[in-house]
Amino acid sequence: MSLDYLGNPIDTRNPATRQGLDDFVGGFLGYQPRAEGILAVADADPDSALANGFAGLLLMFIESPEGPVLAEKYRQRAAAVNSRHPRALVYLQVLQAWINDELDEVLRLSEHLLDLYPRDLLAAKLNQYLEFNRGNWPALLRIGLKATAGAPDIAHSHGLLAFAYEQCHLLEEAEASALEALRLQASEPWAHHALAHVMLTQGRIEEGIGFLEGVKQHWDGLNSFMYTHNWWHLALFYLGRGEDQRVLEIYDRHVWGILPEYSQDQVGAVSLLARLELAGIDVGERWQALAPYLQRRVGDAVQPFLSVQYLYGLARAGKPEADQLLAALRRHSVEARPVWGEVTLPLAEGLLAHARGDARRALEQLGIALPRLNEIGGSHAQRDLFAQVELDARLRVGDWLGAQQTLELRRRYDGLDVPTNRALVVVYEALGLPGEALRARARIGGISVI
């Protein structure tokens, strides 16, 4: 039996195809561009159902309405092989279900693959990706535990588990799993990412800066998502300490412009620009530079978490396509899963209102969406953007009571957070509490307090 580098059965003995399968799996797990070579490998070997199935899966990950259309070519080719290879057959079923938007079936089949082949970390990663997009964090943990049980010697499995623990708020377990991944492979980027989440959540800002600055050399050569996203996390740490110019430098050099056509690069840029503005920092013409790429998303309703950020970016750039995208989301919500109409639409309405300066409308709509934000996917750190927008709307309408409550709760996680304390100065002065305003100012280094 022919096996891949993890010990899973494959349907070819062709050396080039075998290498291509290994490059796809290893590159996918490690966020390396070599994974993209599976397209050429599949084109060169139409008799490998597995190679063509993997090529189709890769195209589904572009997170674009074009994905299923592009993937169908490889699905048809894989099906034409009439393979009897058990693993290839299940992957073909996975691809078919995903193209048909039958996500429950994709999840069932991918976990079935992991049960059949305990070292199939590709199946584990695919399952976690889809559950992540639906906010099912306990499912991530279940899959992560299976992955480490089947492949305890592979660093990527512990990275998968670490992030799952973190999203379940099991921070000590998350840190331990991330450190185990790094013991096995110091360059494991998903473990870097999981530890960044832990440190941010626990307010270990200086430690987070030191850690990420110490491992950033490992991100060179990774695919654009992992490269830009880990830099995005480093930018959040610097933003929390008021290092505004450093954040802008990171944005310009490491967050935007690596692969501007890609969905994750776009929402990372939108999110960081929005956070900069919410912190009172002028971002110049950066929204305008981002806008041409977002304008291509006017009909994009692939993932709610992505669509609402495209919309916010378009609105901040002053583009009419923001209204067109909102109309597309309304149309999609009629027949889509309930989360689109019940959470995504009010979130989109609220973000659009905020971007255009209607803070009261923003508060009204965001108040509907925020309690159920978990259902649209995105990590805790990513979804926090929407809470920050809602907080900014409170400040703009003069809801000092609500803002004070929110800000002091946020300060429990990081007492020295500069944007939080800047806002508290304004709030306490408005509330007639100059002593508290003085203390907030002191926390950002403005003055000393006796």
What do the predicted segments below correspond to?
Residues H233-S448:
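Helix-coil-helix junctions within alpha-helical repeat/solenoid scaffolds
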